[in-house]
């Protein structure tokens, strides 16, 4: 069990996401989210996945691509810090990542499968994490993090976007 991150384990901004998660077992929370997320994504059709609630907003495909890319980037941060690397990591710009993904031209089912596989990889990383690794620290985007803060951030990020999908996109 990882325990919940303390205030000094991430910059205040990130607690917007971390605080959306209840419980204190990061690995279990990330694992529990998988079924709910896949159920939601599985109920969205190819046509619906191209829906945008406003012209300047991402499509559902772009939202899921963003969720997946962000999880991949943050899981790497968790791995980097857990293994004891000391070099700071650069920032992650979601707008650059989104622009480079061309997500609307990838089939919806492929996005869902990619999320599933990335999440399984994240679960495996966290399930096999040594107990003392959860409190190891590192720097990314010029901000301090612990591994457990990153894990809670991953879970909170999905919670945040699933909530937005339900409120603003679904039912389409």
Please provide the spans of the model-predicted regions.
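Short, contiguous alpha-helical
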Residues: 1-9, 13-16, 50-94, 120-123, ...
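Short, charged, low-complexity loops and linkers
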Residues: 12-28
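A short, mixed-charge helix-start or loop-turn motif at secondary-structure junctions
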Residues: 19-23, 101-108, 143-147
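Acidic/histidine-rich alpha-helical segments that form the ligand environment
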Residues: 28-42, 97-135
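Cytochrome P450 catalytic-domain "roof"
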Residues: 42-51
């Amino acid at each position: 069990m990882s325990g919940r991150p303390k205030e000094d384990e991430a910059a205040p901004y990130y607690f917007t996401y971390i605080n959306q998660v209840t419980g204190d077992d990061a690995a279990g929370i990330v694992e529990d989210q998988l079924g709910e997320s896949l159920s939601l994504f599985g109920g969205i059709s190819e046509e619906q996945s191209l829906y945008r609630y406003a012209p300047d907003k991402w499509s559902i495909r772009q939202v899921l691509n963003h969720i997946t890319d962000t999880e991949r980037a943050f899981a790497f941060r968790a791995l980097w810090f857990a293994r004891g690397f000391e070099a700071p990591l650069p920032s992650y710009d979601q707008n650059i990542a989104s622009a480079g993904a061309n997500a609307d031209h990838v089939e919806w089912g492929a996005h869902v499968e990619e999320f599933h596989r990335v999440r399984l990889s994240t679960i495996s990383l966290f399930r096999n994490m040594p107990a003392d690794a959860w409190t190891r620290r590192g720097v990314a985007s010029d901000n301090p993090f612990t591994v457990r803060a990153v894990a809670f951030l991953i879970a909170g990020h999905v919670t945040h976007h699933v909530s937005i999908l339900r409120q603003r996109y679904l039912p389409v």
